[in-house]
């Protein structure tokens, strides 16, 4: 008799990961729960939220009768995620730490711990996402050796794992998984990929998981929590006072504590002014922030992004883009925003230009961009480094990637047409 497949499931202390572990248990797998402590923080009442979450994760394991492990990646999180976050903010960009955390912590540190230390056949998380592999195909990856050398054969390229949008398009989290490597995707299960959030809550309620069901869902940047962001960031970065300047007439309207505290499209807090002003440009040399008087001011819109580097989920660009040098797409740069039609252009130096058919508002430095192909094949890449071209022709950088209508895919052809529109 074959031994049960061993799946190590990341438990956050929340309802999603708890139900993910429950569903794996129901499928007959040998499940182990692991709680990751990535940040030392206190809430407003002086209680360590990580300790509380760990207790909730442990209770989940008790209810499900599965082994529980706790690991600390506080040092790794600081070095690979938070330090990068601070560095990007200091440069005036708007990074997404959730994407970096998934890349370096959950799907690298935790992934290797589960496989190497716990002997996992596969790992699992409570993310709302899917891949192109069925469960049994995921387990088979354990016995497939990674190709050696610089080149892979055509079979391996054609069978790159695709990251697909979840059934619940509102809760879909593939945007945050866009930098997960092929190696990790091949060994990962997403039990919630075909479920809605409401159904997940129903499952929790019917299976004695009330303690996680009653918890409020975490939103925003995890290590900031409910704290004032300006006060938080100024604990780590030195204030760099500068001026608020009108984009229309260069008139000085006020002062600020640091240009890194503002992102494009954000309402600027300028004392003494009744009408709202919005950030449209930042001068990193002088530390000045340019603002406009309307939320729909033309200076807020961009229609061209230039990449400095691209990270492909499939580890290489699609053959069609290489062949034709151009490709029609849709893209997004914020989670849950509507997709915008665009055209990808592959340059000789390997950079990619993204030209939006219609200019988009508040495309900020360091954000993640996504796109979906409008043709009969689907592709996607993960975040790249982009520059924005605006009326002021200022050099910018954007971490972006390409997102398919059904989710993040590995820029490799898929035989059937795109169906539906992603949200």
Regions found by a protein language model. Give the residues of each.
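ATP-dependent adenylation/nucleotidyltransferase module used to activate substrates
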Residues: 1-179, 189, 205, 397, ...
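AMP-forming adenylation/ATP pyrophosphatase catalytic core
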Residues: 40-41, 124-130, 136-423
């Amino acid at each position: 008799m074959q031994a049960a497949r061993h799946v190590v499931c990341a438990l956050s202390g929340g309802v999603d990961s708890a139900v993910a572990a429950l569903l794996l248990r129901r499928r007959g797998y040998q499940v182990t729960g692991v709680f990751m402590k990535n940040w030392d923080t206190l809430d407003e009442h002086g209680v360590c939220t990580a300790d509380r979450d760990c207790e909730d994760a442990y209770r989940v394991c008790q209810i499900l009768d599965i082994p529980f492990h706790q690991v600390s990646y506080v040092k790794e999180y600081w070095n690979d995620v938070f330090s990068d976050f601070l560095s990007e903010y200091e440069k005036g960009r708007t990074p997404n730490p959730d994407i970096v955390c998934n890349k370096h912590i959950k799907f690298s540190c935790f992934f290797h711990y589960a496989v190497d230390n716990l002997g996992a056949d596969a790992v699992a998380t409570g993310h709302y996402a899917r891949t192109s592999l069925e469960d049994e195909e995921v387990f088979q990856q354990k016995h497939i050796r990674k190709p050696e050398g610089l080149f892979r054969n055509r079979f391996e390229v054609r069978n790159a794992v695709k990251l697909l949008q979840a059934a619940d398009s509102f809760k879909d989290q593939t945007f945050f998984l866009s930098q997960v490597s092929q190696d990790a995707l091949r060994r990962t299960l997403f039990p919630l990929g075909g479920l809605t959030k409401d159904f997940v809550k129903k499952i929790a309620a019917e299976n004695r998981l009330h303690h996680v069901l009653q918890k409020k869902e975490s939103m925003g940047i995890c290590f900031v929590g409910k704290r004032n962001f300006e006060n938080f960031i100024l604990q780590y970065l030195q204030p760099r006072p500068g001026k608020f300047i009108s984009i229309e007439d260069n008139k000085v309207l006020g002062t600020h504590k640091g240009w890194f505290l503002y992102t494009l499209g954000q309402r600027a807090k300028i004392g003494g002014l009744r009408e709202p002003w919005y950030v449209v440009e930042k001068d990193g040399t002088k530390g000045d922030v340019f603002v406009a008087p309307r939320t729909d001011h033309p200076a807020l819109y961009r229609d061209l992004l230039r990449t400095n580097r691209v990270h492909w989920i499939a580890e290489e660009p699609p053959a069609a883009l290489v062949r034709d040098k151009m490709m029609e797409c849709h893209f997004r740069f914020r989670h849950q925003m509507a997709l915008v039609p665009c055209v990808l252009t592959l340059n000789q130096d390997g950079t990619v230009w993204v030209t939006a058919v219609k200019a988009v508002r508040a495309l900020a430095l360091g954000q993640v961009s996504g796109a979906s192909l409008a043709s009969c094949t689907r592709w996607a890449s993960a975040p790249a480094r982009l520059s924005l071209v605006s009326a002021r022709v200022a050099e910018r950088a954007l971490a972006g990637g390409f997102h398919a209508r059904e989710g993040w895919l590995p820029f490799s052809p898929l035989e059937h047409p795109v169906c539906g529109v992603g949200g």
